[in-house]
């Protein structure tokens, strides 16, 4: 995978947050969600992976609950997966060395530019 090849050393064993795990935006349906494959990828990389989704409280694929909004600032890698409307107003205080991966163009242009200036942002 492109992510593994480019960021292997940066992500191995890190704390990862998947942002948006439903199958489609603005729904709580997680059946056939692409987030499952992403979760499995980070599991193979020995990462401690959590998720945040204001619409999906419980994700049966991982048998876990979404973290709370107040706990978004404690991760090494942030992976944006689904473009929920509520994410337009989401402001995460990223750590200086955090890696931000936007796999579905979730972040709006002005946020992408602000984050990309920190040199830790990757959009695919």
Predicted segments with their positions:
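Structural/interface elements that position substrates and couple domains in central-metabolism enzymes
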Residues: 1-124
